[in-house]
Amino acid sequence: FKMGKLDAHVIDFIKNDIRTSELLEAVKPSVEILLDIHNLTIELKQDCIIHCDKRWTTEALTNIIKNAIEYSPDGSVIEIDSGENPMYSWISVKDSGMGMDKTEYAALFKRFENSTNENGFGIGMPLALSILKGQGGDIDVDFGGMGEGTTFILKFFK
């Protein structure tokens, strides 16, 4: 349903200046049980102001963080960072997982690629990308190499 609306471009994104810490507080209720089950912590390195639609960006960030939870070993840290440069503001989410091979990247943002725990993805990542693109943004991936974890960078262009 949400993807259909995003695909049809019928959503009016209402952008405001929001702190990264505020977005994380909004994400918390959706992920805190999963964090507890896996003994994971979220660490915010740097707080920044992001110009975005709070409701929809919270949804995108929730999906990215749920993905990080799924691929991080129990007891590890998920690092959130944010900042800005002349072209865009950004939020990054770095997991402590095994990392991702570049060949897996093609399936990452495809809808309903088999959602097994091995290397498949559901609707969450494609939805996150559609939300960012709907706001004139994008998502980049820093693979880091096998055993290094993966970093997702949500970009909000100025």
Segment roles from a protein language model:
Residues 14-17, 39-49:
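Conserved catalytic submotifs in the C-terminal HATPase_c
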Residues 95:
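Acidic ATP/Mg2+-coordinating residue in the GHKL
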Residues 132-133:
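Detector for a conserved hydrophobic position within an alpha-helical segment of the HATPase_c
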Residues 137-138:
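Conserved glycine-rich
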Residues 100-112:
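Short conserved segment of the HATPase_c
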Residues 20, 57-58:
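A residue-level detector for a conserved hydrophobic packing site
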Residues 75-87:
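Short beta-strand/loop element within the Bergerat-fold HATPase_c
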Residues 68-69:
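Short helix-loop "hinge" at the ATP-lid/N-box region of the Bergerat-fold HATPase_c
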